[in-house]
Amino acid sequence: MPTYGYRRVHAILKRQARAAGLKPANHKRIYRVMKAHGLLLNRHAGGIERRHDGRIAVDERNRRWCSDGFEIGCDNGERVRVAFALDCCDREAMSFLATTGGISGDDVRDLMVAAVEHRFGRVNRLPVTIEWLSDNGSCYIAGDTRSFARDIGLEPRTTPIESPQSNGMAEAFVRTIKRDYVRVSSRPDAETVMRQLPSWIAHYNEVHPHKALGYRSPREFIAAHGRS
């Protein structure tokens, strides 16, 4: 990926070397090679990073899920709106949906069902209660949505009003998708974006190295720690 720094490149190459039965190169060597060829990324010098006071990440899978949404602009002026659900331990994008309209309460409820079925199969109710963290968007705080969440075993939790950064893990996912996939892909219209979105999410889940996961992808982390 053209947006990967040397540590993520090293993680990818190490994964490939081990699959081929070869000794992986040292990360310092990767740094030197990338520097020699002008491939190192510039240090981020943007605005002040917003921080949250609470800890979003958890140590066990299926304890807390977070959800949020974002927009993707197209060259022709169309906009694609995406909503997603992440596990706050392994960072897997368990479910997502995209529309050219607004994200509705019905959409969020579909998102919940898709996440539950991805992790537990077709069940009427989760075997354990899982927190569902979101902001205070109308589609999330609607009475029907909160009631439905509890009916299937999710416990709705919302970030403090005017503090969306408290859902920092979801924000980090949005930044990753926009930086590593959206900005380097063709976006002539909504149809093209929506056609590419599943492959972006699949690559994120299967390949994208996370610093918090020891530079493993979500699926690598899941495989190493079991699927339960």
Please give the residue ranges for each predicted region.
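Charged DNA-binding/catalytic regions of mobile-element recombinases
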Residues: 1-228
